[in-house]
């Protein structure tokens, strides 16, 4: 069984608005390494739609992009992508699959079938899966910014405090810190 690893950009005040993160070669290389380590991507519909509107064009070369960003796009194009949605059924992007029915069972089945693990990259979906105790590790890229607005991570709350064990904290040149945690005991 593979691990479910939640990874996202966030500011010091917990904002997960994708426009608030630092998008440079180093941060893209960080996420490319994470994607290389995992066997599949898992997103909610909103994240999928944001991604499908841009990254396939970068992978095809229709949009000019620096080498690190193009590398991310090409690898993402080839990666299996699983989407949780109750409002959309058609996901035409290459290697995209719809998780339907019982969320807990569907995600557990995906973990069981993906020995290299699943990389989860949607904030709202992460909160829901964390309430189900399905997330095994957290690889967060914390940016040196205070956004002062939302959306924020876990704004819908959890039933109790989640205790984590720090595995590593790695500063990047841009001032962001890559934090790696796993669930404690």
What kind of region is each of these model predictions?
Residues 1-185:
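Enzymes that bind and transform nitrogen-containing heteroaromatic metabolites
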């Amino acid at each position: 069984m593979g691990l479910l690893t939640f990874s996202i950009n966030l500011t010091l005040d917990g904002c997960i608005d994708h426009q608030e993160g630092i998008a440079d070669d180093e941060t893209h290389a960080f996420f490319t390494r994470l994607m290389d380590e995992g066997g599949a991507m898992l997103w909610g519909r909103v994240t999928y739609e944001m991604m499908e509107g841009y990254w396939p064009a970068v992978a095809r070369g229709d949009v000019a992009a620096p080498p690190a960003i193009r590398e991310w796009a090409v690898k993402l194009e080839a990666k299996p992508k699983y989407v949780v949605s109750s409002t959309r059924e058609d996901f035409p992007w290459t290697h995209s699959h719809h998780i339907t029915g019982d969320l807990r069972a569907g995600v557990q089945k995906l973990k069981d079938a993906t020995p290299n693990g699943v990389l989860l990259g949607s904030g709202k979906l992460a909160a829901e899966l964390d309430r189900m105790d399905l997330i095994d590790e957290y690889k967060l890229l914390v940016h040196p910014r205070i956004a002062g607005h939302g959306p924020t991570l876990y704004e819908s709350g959890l039933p109790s405090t989640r205790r984590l064990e720090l595995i590593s904290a790695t500063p990047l040149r841009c001032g962001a810190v890559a934090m790696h945690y796993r669930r404690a005991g």
